[in-house]
Amino acid sequence: TFGNSKPFRIKIRNVLNDNFTYFYVKKADASRIYGLEFEHLLSPNRINFLVYKDTLIEEHIAGIPGDIFIKEHLPLCTDRARNEIAKQFVKFNERCTLRLLGDMRSYNYVVIPTHDFDHVDYKIRAIDFDQQNYEGNLKVYQPHFFKENRPMVKLVTDFLEDSSVNQYKKEDMSQVA
């Protein structure tokens, strides 16, 4: 089990075409439900979930776990890709702060590569939606303060000017407005 939700993954298969999708069944609690609601309302990413009594069913978010991405994929990225990842990390950091989404260590988010004609675009999404809105320390809600995310923070300092960081923060906030 992981944490206090005791999750398990189920695979639902369409018998007509053999397509399938994964869902997670977890013990429901208020902080997790609030986190999912905020994700759905305040993020450009929508997530499907269902709550029944003390059970939560949450759709699987596909991607490469952040800790694995940092170890295995990041060293192989081009400078253009690193620049894109830095931009996405700034936006992800902003979204976590806005949604009071705490504990975004690298194993609590995924990096989603999308292949285009001549390059790969990247997005970063949370996969653990526990809220810590009772915490008075703002650092809890900012992924760049966690040591596991230092390689991502280094990308930001190496590839982005302060003016670009501010621009990306404003871009992300404008999606909520």
Show the residue positions of the predicted features.
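Detector for Asparagine
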Residues: 4, 14-19, 45-48, 83, ...
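AlphaC helix of the protein kinase catalytic domain
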Residues: 68-76
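Glycine-rich loops and low-complexity Gly/Arg-rich segments
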Residues: 49-51, 72-73, 82-83, 149-154
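Conserved ATP-binding subdomain of kinase catalytic cores across diverse folds
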Residues: 1-68
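Conserved kinase catalytic-core segment
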Residues: 76-141
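C-terminal catalytic region of ATP-dependent kinase domains
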Residues: 116-177
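Short, low-complexity, polar/charged sequence segments that are solvent-exposed and flexible
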Residues: 29-30, 42-46, 75-79, 143-148
